[in-house]
Amino acid sequence: MKFVGAHVSASGGVDNAPLNAMAIGAKAFAVFAKNQRQWVAKPLEEKTIEAFKKNLETAGILPKHVLPHDSYLINLGHPEEEKLEKSRAAFIDELERCNQLGLDKLNFHPGSHLVKIPKKDPEYHEKLMEAELHCLDVIAESMNLAIEATKGSDVKLVIENTAGQGTNLGYKFEHLAHLIEKVEDKSRVGVCLDTCHTFTAGYDLRTREAYDETMDAFERIVGFEYLMGMHINDSKPKLGSRVDRHASLGQGEIGWDAFCFIMNDPRMDDIPLILETIDESLWPEEIKALYALVKK
């Protein structure tokens, strides 16, 4: 069975998120655990935690179908020590917030190496590979430190694949596999596949053959046992453009066939499938449209 929803607002308090999800007919949702544009937030109050859990029950949504997202400020691979420490502390705080809310996942973008290498440098590819590998190791170290700091918790660190825009890592399945390999406690790690990011990173999804090829590569390199959520987005940019711009379903370069393949793929059962499409007013329709694709 599929559990589709969207990244809903936590305006007025995170406890409102389940009700916002219910209002659009969602069976899953994503939410920012705290304000995504601030480093520090006041601790969660007990009444907020209780209200969140109560509203989750009211909405009929299970904690495992909630996919919280961390702050966009966090870069677990930051090359500057001070900013890296700040990112690590904020990430640990968000893991603790998820645990307080009774949730078992925290979705995050791996990080960016921020190294500027001129394209015309004759050693461009060697220097790029070196910068990426070093950054991946720093991210893995950040993950291990975060897991160690939250030992009593079972919140999983869910790595999101990226479009590879700028110096963002996570645009190759090999990046995800590298991080998983370096994480000591593999019971605390997972992956979220974003369809727009997958497509603009160069993995096609538009035909049956292309979809199967991409998912076979994911299984071979990462493994479906690590898939803990998906972001369901169409893409404004073309295949392999390495640009991250979401589009409403059927209004981008990916098209409906790919979403039909996902909705009929048993490997995507029982995980949150989250819309992050650009027009929130279409979310109720998009959720219905996705369920309508399921072949009886």
UniProtKB/Swiss-Prot annotation:
Q: Which Pfam families match?
A: AP_endonuc_2
Under Enzyme Commission nomenclature, its number is: 3.1.21.2
Family the entry assigns: Belongs to the AP endonuclease 2 family.
Under which name does UniProt file this protein?
Probable endonuclease 4
Q: Where does Zn(2+) 3 bind?
A: H197, D244, H246
Q: Where are the transmembrane segments?
A: none
Functional description taken from the UniProt entry: Endonuclease IV plays a role in DNA repair. It cleaves phosphodiester bonds at apurinic or apyrimidinic (AP) sites, generating a 3'-hydroxyl group and a 5'-terminal sugar phosphate.
One GO biological process this protein is involved in is:
base-excision repair
The cofactor note from the UniProt entry for this protein is: Binds 3 Zn(2+) ions.
Residue positions annotated to bind Zn(2+) 1 are H69, H109, E160
Sorted alphabetically, the keyword list is: DNA damage, DNA repair, Endonuclease, Hydrolase, Metal-binding, Nuclease, Zinc
Q: What reaction is this protein's catalytic activity?
A: Endonucleolytic cleavage to 5'-phosphooligonucleotide end-products
Please list the cofactors this protein needs.
Answer: Zn(2+)
Q: Which GO terms describe its molecular function?
A: deoxyribonuclease IV (phage-T4-induced) activity; DNA binding; DNA-(apurinic or apyrimidinic site) endonuclease activity; phosphoric diester hydrolase activity; zinc ion binding
For the ligand (Zn(2+) 2), the binding residues are: E160, D194, H231, E276
